[in-house]
């Protein structure tokens, strides 16, 4: 039987990423054959990964990488926040973002076939990571954005990499694009414009806003405060020419009832119409980038600010770790019971 030296164990660990004991056991089982030991570790790793496949991985990091006129933002998940801070995990995320940006896959299936610097496919690299790190590690999603030479990328990560943003700006400069990405990270828009919102979605969100107003009015009634009116509209998509004309007519009637002279109406009406638009586009403000108040200049919307500096936003992508993943509630008593049962059965 071949002697299993510390040098041999170290060599296997460097090639496989396995722990000391796992590497030593593999060498013992393969009589010191490095290549067979690597294959054995890979098989064991796949078995370990398969056992973890059904676990929920909702922690992790985003990765952002810019490669010339192509940028990628990705999300990689782990089971715990602790592992998400692991140096091996962070390196895996950053490497994956680079491979995605350079490989430009069309979908997740294509991305899994890309070759990592280790020579493994991306899919195999994640199986290996699951085995060596000891938690389910999964590549969840990516977005690729391309720009022209005249446009600018804004790349930004927030909260230790839990949020990743890429934006493309025409006009302006890279600093403006980064500021815009910071806004996107903070304000969570999901689409660029009201034109991208589904009609039924707007109706549902408007109903929810009015439900909140109803709850607020119950509290106001208890302290004899006047009730707040319901919102009639939630999006610019609902503000037809007829609706806007009626709003202006209502404002004029209000000014006449207040006895305001007609010669000053032209100075008052624009401000009141701006207020009408603001009050009746609450859904747009929550979900569309252009309608949001710009965090770098709260006197303007994003759209108005960009117009003031002769710039426009072309596209953006925002990932936040765990979005849409339902986390399993941990039942501590059940977990302890299962652990004790397993121990008794061994």
UniProtKB/Swiss-Prot annotation:
Give the UniProt entry's GO cellular component terms.
cytoplasm
Recorded superkingdom: Bacteria
Region annotation (Involved in Mg(2+) ion dislocation from EF-Tu) maps to 80-83
Localization per Swiss-Prot or TrEMBL: Cytoplasm
**Keyword vocabulary terms for this entry:** Cytoplasm, Elongation factor, Protein biosynthesis
Entry-linked InterPro entries: EF-Ts_dimer_sf, Transl_elong_EFTs/EF1B, Transl_elong_EFTs/EF1B_dimer, Transl_elong_Ts_CS, UBA-like_sf
**Keyword Aminoacyl-tRNA synthetase tagged:** no
- Recorded coiled-coil stretches: none
Gene Ontology molecular function: any one: translation elongation factor activity
Q: What does this protein do?
A: Associates with the EF-Tu.GDP complex and induces the exchange of GDP to GTP. It remains bound to the aminoacyl-tRNA.EF-Tu.GTP complex up to the GTP hydrolysis stage on the ribosome.
Q: Which family does it belong to?
A: Belongs to the EF-Ts family.
Q: Known HAMAP family for this protein?
A: EF_Ts
Protein's UniProt name: Elongation factor Ts
């Amino acid at each position: 039987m071949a002697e299993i030296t510390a040098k041999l164990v170290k060599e296997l660990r460097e090639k496989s990423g396995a722990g000391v004991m796992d590497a030593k056991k593999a060498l013992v089982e393969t009589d010191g054959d490095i290549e067979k030991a690597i294959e054995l570790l890979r098989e064991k790793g796949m078995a370990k990964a398969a056992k973890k496949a059904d676990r929920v991985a909702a922690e992790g990091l985003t990765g952002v990488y810019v490669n010339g006129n192509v940028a990628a933002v990705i999300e990689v998940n782990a089971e715990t926040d602790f592992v998400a801070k692991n140096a091996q995990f962070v390196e895996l995320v950053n490497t994956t973002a680079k491979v995605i940006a350079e490989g430009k896959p069309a979908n997740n299936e294509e991305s899994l076939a890309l070759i990592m610097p280790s020579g493994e496919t991306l899919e195999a690299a994640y199986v290996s990571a699951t085995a060596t790190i000891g938690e389910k590690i999964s590549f969840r999603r990516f977005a690729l954005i391309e720009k022209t030479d005249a446009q600018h990328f804004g790349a930004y990560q927030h909260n230790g990499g839990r949020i990743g943003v890429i934006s493309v700006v025409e006009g302006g400069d890279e600093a403006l694009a980064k500021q815009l990405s910071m806004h996107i990270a903070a304000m969570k828009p999901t689409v660029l414009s009201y034109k991208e919102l589904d009609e039924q979605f707007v109706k549902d969100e408007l109903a929810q806003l009015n439900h909140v107003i109803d709850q607020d009015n119950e509290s106001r009634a208890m302290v004899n405060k006047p009730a707040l009116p319901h919102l009639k509209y939630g999006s610019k998509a609902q503000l037809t020419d007829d609706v806007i004309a009626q709003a202006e007519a209502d404002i004029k009637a209000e000014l006449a009832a207040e006895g305001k002279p007609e010669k000053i109406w032209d100075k008052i009406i624009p401000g009141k119409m701006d207020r009408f638009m603001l009050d009746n586009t609450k859904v747009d403000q929550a979900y569309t980038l252009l309608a949001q108040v710009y965090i770098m200049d709260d006197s303007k919307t994003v759209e108005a600010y960009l117009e003031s500096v002769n710039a426009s936003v072309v596209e953006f992508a925002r990932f936040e770790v765990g979005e849409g993943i339902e986390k399993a509630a941990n039942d501590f008593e059940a977990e302890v019971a299962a652990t004790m049962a397993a121990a008794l059965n061994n």
